[in-house]
Amino acid sequence: MCGITGWVDFKKQLVQEKQTMDRMTDTLSKRGPDDSNVWGEHHVLFGHKRLAVVDIEGGRQPMACTYKGDTYTIIYNGELYNTEDLRKELRARGHQFERTSDTEVLLHSYIEWQEDCVDHLNGIFAFAVWDEKRNLLFAARDRLGVKPFFYTKEGSSFLFGSEIKAILAHPDIKARVDRTGLSEIFGLGPSRTPGTGIFKGIKEIRPAHALTFSKDGLNIWRYWNVESEKHTDSFDDTVANVRSLFQDAVTRQLVSDVPVCTFLSGGLDSSAITAIAAGHFEKEGKAPLHTYSIDYEENDKYFQASAFQPNDDGPWIEKMTEAFGTTHHKCVISQKDLVDHLEEAVLVKDLPGMADVDSSLLWFCREIKKDFVVSLSGECADEIFGGYPWFHTADVESGFPWMRSTEERIKLLSDSWQKKLNLKEYVNAKYEETLAETPLLDGETGVDKARRQLFYLNMLWFMTNLLDRKDRMSMGASLEVRVPFADHRLVEYVWNIPWEMKMHDNREKGILRKALEGILPDDILYRKKSPYPKTHHPEYTKGVSEWLKTIRSQKDSVLHTLLDRKQLDQLLETEGSSFKVPWFGQLMKGPQLIAHLAQIHTWFEAYRIDIDER
């Protein structure tokens, strides 16, 4: 993985602006500590930071290729999982290769198919190509949004980067947030509307979208979406296809020239990846596979079972390591480290995040990076197979199911900002826009229509939020994380499996469990879903409460402008329990909400953000 950034301006000679590009590139050092390079000519500048994973010596970027007299230059963040398939096809079409990297294959894919190259790619990617012949920039982002690509148009300049901080390093870009940005933070955060960058004027290429920037202007289009079709496969064929697609996705994503490990929580998703990876390692003579889990200091003492988290992960992890002979590493984070990483998590993400869910992941990825460069993780299974509790309620309610807190959020704002933002209307509009975009089957109505819309909401919003978190926290540790459940072939197939099949044996993710029979031990196979672990330690609550109290004592804190003083005081007095529902997701409440508000203060202060009230 890497960090990319660039600047295109057809009215300026940019070669003399390389110092600015150096600054923009340097902001992405954590994404690519192994190499750094800047390239430019006339109206374009590219910057690249590299984390070397495949073709260590030959994969330097920006990478240029002259083909039939025309020169093309690429910067690319990601990983292709069909590199050799593409290389073979392109060779048959007359292309020659000097290296073994997927970057060169991607560049030749663009040369051969131009904008249609994205239709041929299996992988996670965000990349930009300067096409000298056509005098334009082409850029694209992977189908599910695993890799980020932010951009802005400022005057005649088009600026972009893997992270917002690269764009903000340009002298013409100021850190501002307007009413729309604040509506995102307080109405929808820590998720955000697909395509928005929160900062005024900064946007993100949506998943499965591409763009060109030329003298004719900016053109953006969607190149992929799930398509709703009648599922005609038998149950047995469906099980076999799910198994085959998933096994192929995992196996393809194990390709690397550097050490690979897996996350392992003992849950269904990470265990499935671990089982297949361990078998592959055994077959290839690379065993044992190394696995990693995270736990919290004194969690055995303070763990609180709930409907969402009925039991601790520990015993399940032990079952997996024994069954597959993995070398397991249990990483235990202290409450101090958990609190201390909260501020840095904001700086890594460029936005307020999911409190300790982010900070623990950042710390965890740094522990893994001490010995590994690449890890596989189980994100996306719940979104595509229907694993979350809100898929299983008696009736599919309206509104974002992971966020039932709009009324409570509104009360937290000061009177003046309640009037300025109109959060309820804003949130509902975003919800309705997504429903209207959902690709439905002809004639689909009632519960079937509502359920398909629910899956689409999860894919576009909740899944991209978790992928966003995983990218930023892992790359903040210079660790590449791959997500086999986000393989677009698997997503396309599962999209049309009827709910009754997905719920085989009346179990959440029942079809996936059936597909994994014979691969996983039965007790792991039928373990109830449990989310990412959280701390219940009173020291964490104390730590974040003291942090927010210190912020409250600062007269110039933006929280005094935005929040209702009585609500803030009550939140601190009750250690977060005055806020009656989770701020976001299943477990983000109490001390997590306190930490999130402190992160909002940190964000405004660290980025010196001005509020544009117009």
Curated annotation (Swiss-Prot):
Keywords: Amino-acid biosynthesis, Asparagine biosynthesis, ATP-binding, Glutamine amidotransferase, Ligase, Nucleotide-binding, Sporulation
SUPFAM superfamilies in alphabetical order: Adenine nucleotide alpha hydrolases-like, N-terminal nucleophile aminohydrolases (Ntn hydrolases)
GO MF: asparagine synthase (glutamine-hydrolyzing) activity; ATP binding
Residues annotated as catalytic: C2
EC number: 6.3.5.4
Biological process, per Gene Ontology: L-asparagine biosynthetic process; sporulation resulting in formation of a cellular spore
Catalytic activity: L-aspartate + L-glutamine + ATP + H2O = L-asparagine + L-glutamate + AMP + diphosphate + H(+)
Gene3D superfamilies on file: Glutamine Phosphoribosylpyrophosphate, subunit 1, domain 1, HUPs
Pfam families the record matches: Asn_synthase, GATase_7
Site (Important for beta-aspartyl-AMP intermediate formation) location in chain: E379
Known role: Asparagine synthetase involved in sporulation.
Listed name of the protein: Asparagine synthetase [glutamine-hydrolyzing] 3
The species this protein was found in: Bacillus subtilis (strain 168)
Annotated gene: asnO
